[in-house]
Structure formats: structure tokens, C-alpha cells
């Protein structure tokens, strides 16, 4: 984060929403080159839910679109139910949502690394296929 960005953030009114909006505006000005759509990785945990709800506020105020993406790794019997629950939360919040599924056989060892690599590949492939070049993750 640049020194100027840090100083601008300090001048905001201090609320988390205002700070997030300020940060997103600065990121868009500096990096996103006029993009209208952004993706958000949402696992359903507290961090990613907080991020997507804050980004929704920013998107509404700035005329941007956010798309929430959840990866179902299919590693637990309840993983699809968990992803469906996130989909329900996003629907209630008026946020477009897609569930991406890690298909195929899973490795016996190194599962965490393989799952992370599969997650990033799925997210990147979806974004590129849909003309989205920025993804937020918590």
C-alpha cells in the first residue's frame, strides 16, 4: 500500500465500510483500468462473508458489479450443502453467485496443496472466461 493511500485512508470517517470503499476506489483508480465487474472468493467463513458484504456496499455506491464465487472441493460429504448455503446468503444479499466444483480424483497425500491449487485454477479460469480480471479474497 502506498504512503498516499495510507494517508487517504486515515482521513476517512473511520468506519469499516467507508475505509473499504476508499480502499476499493483507490485500487480501481490505480489498477483496474475502468473495470465494471469484480469477483470475490467466498468460502462461507467470517472473513470472506465480511469481505463480500463490504464489497457489495462499495459496488452499489460506485456502480460496479461483484460476483461471488465458491469452490466446492468435494472433500467432505457436506461440502455441497455448505456451498448451497453460501449461495442462499448471496441470493438474499442480491449478489450474483456461482459454485465451482473440483471434479475428479483427489490425491491421497498433499491434499491441502492440491486443493489450494485447484481452487485458484477454478477461480482464475472462471474469471478469465467471464471477462473479470480482478478477484478479491479473504
Residues of each region from the PLM?
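Core alpha/beta nucleotide-donor-binding catalytic domains of modification enzymes
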Residues: 2-138
